[in-house]
Structure formats: C-alpha cells, structure tokens
Amino acid sequence: MLRELLSPKTESKRVDGERPANFNVLVGKLSEVLVRAVDKPLGYAINWGRLWSLWPVHLETACCSLEFGAASGPRYDVERFGIIEAFGSLRQCDLMVVQGTVTRKMAPRVRMIYDQMPEPKYVIAMGACAITGGLYFDSYNVLPGIDGVIPVDVYVPGCPPRPETLIQGCILLQEKIKRTRFR
C-alpha cells in the first residue's frame, strides 16, 4: 500500500510550491507504519520504566503509616521494588497509598489529590480502614472504603498490614502495569 502511494503516477500539472494530491494520504499512512513498528518495543520500555520507578504520595490517617515506614527501612527496603521515596509535588507522583480511615469530610480532598496526579496513576488501599472503614465502619462520618471516592488498583489487607504484605501488593501492582498497554 505504501509503495503504491510512493510510486509515480501520471504527472499532474501543479504550480510550484503546491503539494501533490496524495501528500496527506502518504503522511497518514507513513505515521501508521511508524506507529506499528515502534509501538510494541517503545511501549515495553515505557512500561518497564513505570513499573520500576513509582513515586508514591501517602495519605496517612492511622497506624498503617508506621508499617509503611518499616517497609521503607533497611530491613525490607521497598525501594528495590521500584517504590521511590521522593518528596516532591503531587504532580510528580504516580502512586497514591491510602493508609487509614477516610471520613466524608476528607473525601473531596482525597479526590482533589488524585486528580492532581499525572496519568497513569495508581492507587493502593492499605489496611482495613482504607478498604472497609476498619473499626469505625459503622460511624456516621466514616466512608466504607475509598473505592467509592477513587478507583483502587490494589488492596493490601490487614490491621495494620505487615511490610511483607505491602511488598506483595507492590508486586501485584507491577504485574498490573506490565499487562497494561502503553497509551
């Protein structure tokens, strides 16, 4: 198909500086060919970079934050799994780790933080409080989990979850990133 477009056809009279009639079709087909040739290897490289350099933002309201701190320490060293502890802007983070109870008053703020993160963005709900409301599930002001406010990619159960469980959740998130197609 590309050869047909590139082959010289009957000479049409055109004024100098004008493009041939099939120029736009040629550019469109050429871009399709390039996208097909580059899409898979480039997508693999970009997903590889994403899965080994997740920048988390923490929403800490309960004891799960202590376990995340333990996972970041030298014994478990969560950085070897690509969770980079960097302190920057929300617009640089691509992973939100929600740890603890989320109240109705906090829900708009959680959504605002999520909306400020760049695409692709991922969410880990860590602990029973973030997943189901925890001990305060029947309180009038506590949300029964954050999945009603923002989409959750990985649930890490426990009260509080052990660092090993958090690492397993990070590995599950990496598997999900591997399976997604680069956009």
Task: Please describe what each predicted stretch is.
Residues 2, 80, 98, 102-107, ...:
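Metallocofactor- and cofactor-centric catalytic cores in central/energy metabolism, strongly enriched
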Residues 1-89, 117-121, 137, 142-143, ...:
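Iron-sulfur (Fe-S) cluster-binding modules
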Residues 71, 92-100:
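Short, basic, glycine/proline-bearing loop/turn elements
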Residues 65-67, 101-105, 130-132, 161-164:
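Gly/Ser/Thr-rich loops at beta-strand to alpha-helix junctions
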